[in-house]
Swiss-Prot record:
Protein name, per record: 4-hydroxy-3-methylbut-2-enyl diphosphate reductase
Pathway entry: Isoprenoid biosynthesis; dimethylallyl diphosphate biosynthesis; dimethylallyl diphosphate from (2E)-4-hydroxy-3-methylbutenyl diphosphate: step 1/1; Isoprenoid biosynthesis; isopentenyl diphosphate biosynthesis via DXP pathway; isopentenyl diphosphate from 1-deoxy-D-xylulose 5-phosphate: step 6/6
Domain of life the protein comes from: Bacteria
Gene Ontology MF: a single term: 4-hydroxy-3-methylbut-2-enyl diphosphate reductase activity
Family of the protein in this entry: Belongs to the IspH family.
HAMAP family registered for this protein in UniProt: IspH
Binding site for isopentenyl diphosphate: H41, H74, H124, S226, S227, N228, S270
Enzyme class: oxidoreductase
Origin organism lineage: Bacteria, Pseudomonadati, Pseudomonadota, Gammaproteobacteria, Pseudomonadales
Residues at which [4Fe-4S] cluster binds: C12, C96, C198
UniProt KW keywords: 4Fe-4S, Iron, Iron-sulfur, Isoprene biosynthesis, Metal-binding, Oxidoreductase
EC number in record: 1.17.7.4
Note on how the cofactor is bound: Binds 1 [4Fe-4S] cluster per subunit.
Protein residues bound to dimethylallyl diphosphate: H41, H74, H124, S226, S227, N228, S270
Amino acid sequence: MQIKLANPRGFCAGVDRAIEIVNRALEVFGPPIYVRHEVVHNKFVVEDLRNRGAVFVEELDQVPDDVIVIFSAHGVSQAVRQEAAGRGLKVFDATCPLVTKVHIEVAKYSRDGRECILIGHAGHPEVEGTMGQYDASNGGSIYLVEDEKDVAALQVRNPDHLAFVTQTTLSMDDTSRVIDALRERFPNIGGPRKDDICYATQNRQDAVKQLADECDVVLVVGSPNSSNSNRLRELAERMSTPAYLIDGAEDLQRSWFDGAQRIGITAGASAPEVLVRGVIDQLKAWGATGAEELDGREENITFSMPKELRVRSLI
């Protein structure tokens, strides 16, 4: 068996920044540091931060007074921000800047009284945060659609004063079909010049297509609650290549590779490279050889840290 590695894979700039914000806060201020929701959707990362003193909660009413709170990379609603401000909590915002860009778009549509359609997955924290940027007091509404059927059933107040945005971690192919359906039903709909799916999601989906085309089996390292990791697995399967989503080497089953000659490995944007290396080691223990890195797009994007966390404490 030969191992092929997708390129790029693993951490993106937004995930790097979010994890570093928690790490720096722990170093500068000491534990406990409270984090609203998992800072990124990866079991290994969350457990590591928890062991260092991060406390993960789902709502701010689980947070004591006079502590530091970090908002996760997925973003939060305006109501959550107002709740934190009302309690005087010290907040560091780890929202991915590309998610913040979508928030700004929604807020602008809201101020203009323009109704907004969000393409995304119900229940995902990024979707909840983005929906929560819309202020309906101006007379508009924000609607969530997941697929073309939702578009067909959608009832809006003014089809000529309408715009759309998208969740950043969707399947590019699926999203293109939904956008086409929106433009067909609402010819005057506005939106971004390109969809809001982030560069890292696009690059990893392109890379997994190449991987699935060249391999007999594809492994996606990522946690089950990771949206972008699930999209990678689905994309490989649509290309008729068996694909499995795994947290790490402990999830591997040897029977998956019966008759396989080429095994492809990629990782979602919230999965650290150490987990990929563990998978490679296990496959090599079962007789796999090599670990060929495929050609792919170079990523050199970085996002800045909050000012108070840019210099490590000397204490």
